[in-house]
Amino acid sequence: MRKYISILAMACLMAACSTTSGVPDGDQLYTGVDKISYENYEPNQHADQMKEEMEISLAAEPNGALFGSSSLRFPFPPNLLIWNAYHDKEGGFAKWMTSSFGKEPVLMSRVNPELRTTVAQSVLRSHGYFNGQVSHSIVQSHNPKKARISYLVNMGHLWTLDSIAYVGFPLGCDTLIQQSLPLANIHKGDPFDVTTLSSERNRISNLLRSNGYYYFQPSYSYYLADTLAVPGKAQLRFQMVDDIPEQARHRWYIGKVNVEFRKRIMDRIDTVTNYRRLSIGFSGKRPPIRPRVVLSNLRLRPNRLYNYENHLESIEKVNAMGIYSMVDFQFTPRDTTATCDTLDLKLNCVFDKPYDFYIETRATGSSVGRMGPELVVGLSKRNAFRGGEKFDIAFHGSYAWQLNGGHNNYYEYGFETSVEFPRLIAPFMGGNRDRIRRDGTRRRRRFFTTPTTLARISNNVINRPGYFNMNTITGEWTYKWQRTPTSRFQFSPIILQYQFKNRVSDKFTRLQDSLLYVSYMMEDKLVPQMRFTYTYTSPSSYRNPIAWETTISEAGNLISAGMLAFGKKWNEKNKNLYKIPYAQFLKLETDFTKTWHVGDYSTLVTHLNLGLMYTYGNNFSDTAPFSEYFYVGGATSLRGWSARNIGPADFDPDWLDNRTLRYLRMGTIKGVINLEYRPRLFGNLYGAVFLDAGNVWMHHNLLHNLLVNIEDAVSDAEAAVVPESPDTPEIEIDPEAERSVINFLGSLDRGKFSFRRLGNDLAVNTGIGLRYDLGFIMLRLDWGLGLHVPYETGKSGYFNASPFGRDQTIHFAVGLPF
């Protein structure tokens, strides 16, 4: 490897004598755009959109462009130097160097600024700037073989629409158009924009096709504009072409509907069966998919008017099943007579391969210093039960060891199996069938995307040698649906988790007896949960969108309500279901994000995350499962600290010396607010400056209740260090860690939420970061610096953190934080 690196380094050094040696005579090396200047520019949303399109048409990357920038470049591009040195030489090494590492020079003649100027001027005119002009000039470098390009854009007057008239359409079409004018994309006073005019023409075409005019096309209509009647404005006429085909002038109805299924595209159809008014052809003894499922996915029915929206919905629903490799809708007139108004539909479906096999490898780590590999092996089957279902089963195994050389290694294994149905399965939903109104007509149940029902069961086994073997069995039934492009829903009427230990050692039993918080965390428990999530995102056309997600969940309340009938009190502790204690709580979490576009490419984002959990009823010491508690810190929260390094409230980390007890830094109340400015630096590279504030709190003395009798626990732990007899196993307990818990207990009163101390309890950090947009993924690097911590640090004033000491963290992540 070193040999190849040395060869490449020497090759670059030899070639570094010139970056223009490969530039032919009479041409120049293009080194980027010098600047793009604008005259008569009036800032508004329309002009900003035009400006963005203008700069795209003028952009051209030089050799060594930094992150796709047209203006910033590396002064000595290695690829160009290698190409100059070896492109004209013979021999295998020279050809390998040129093809593998070289890149030919970007010449001024190839960039062709004259052509780009012409294209940019057409962009101006297509956006209504008919009097605009674009010019360019060559900016010479001190090296005559190098040059940059400077562009000048004189936008001129923006032409607008003075009036709009729809003329020349048949009576039926004209009636539909006039009724739909409130939905028109163009209005009096709007800019004369070709893109908007085209969208209106497509709207009219889709409107007519959705009302039976199957053969109507956008090209059957056109615009006429009078730009002389009113100076600087256009009087617009939208009308139908005179000589359109006769079949595009009248409505069409759906006739026969035939569906043919094939496993391979060349398979022959040997069996045909009828279901209601649907004809299904296939090969074999029975249809590969149940006819009722086929009918529920088709919105085009016999003897009904053709509807383009129903056509698109049918395509989307059939493809969304994920079981076909090809889907083809064919519409054919029943005969060739002039009076024919019936279209027969033939749907050809070719099935995809039924099975997928996958293997995944992962590296796992935890905040308590354990790390290890994980392997996942799975199998998926499409159309598992002839209803478009997807069946999946996966097995996983992992091993983790203590990085500091301790004896806390463990291994984990388990499986997960799930079935996803491409419809809602519930007694109160009635599948995806249409509902009947009181007057006997059908009321469509429309969804923006195909709704799904997920059934999942998993089992996970953790084996800690010398301590315990614990099983966690989880079952879930979840609905997902989306009625509009902006709103999504997810409802899980039951998420059941059962945790129990198969085997425990004497060593672990003594540890439980000594530490009550370990006893609670590891006790056998049942968590019967219900959860609902609503997500809203603004339409993509909004310049300053919002995103909002709220989740409400509860556990144990329905069971406790049912036990009232058997004489159990609501607040009675330690009630069991089938001899298993169950959890009881209410939990609410909401997440809100608002984005403002600042200038052309920069954004300002604010983010708010709030959470509240209330534990009561059947819970031991008013505690909930540890996985349900809130925590802060990490790459998407308070970026000045790693996860679980802040809170609750003004808890001092020096009170808790053992990092294995970091999970205690949690709360039942959570509040985080973030402010982040994301400017584009150049190309696809963006910067970030952010400010984060937040914390977690307890709504009561939760951990004090959990760690009650801690002094006795410490005494037991210290006594357990000395074996009672040679046959008694030694318990690995660190008395110093237990004393740190005593210190922690002393602070718990201040861990409770208080409006009076809210200003001081909020941990605050700032920071900077980089974001690189690869198109399909965003890479992110953040450096968070603490400004204020809610506990005493020995520093006076509000800014008491150590931003260049322990209160700083670097995060590398994929995707934006919010």
Which role does the model predict for each range below?
Residues V672-P679, G687, A693, L762-L774, ...:
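Conserved C-terminal beta-signal and adjacent last beta-strands/turns
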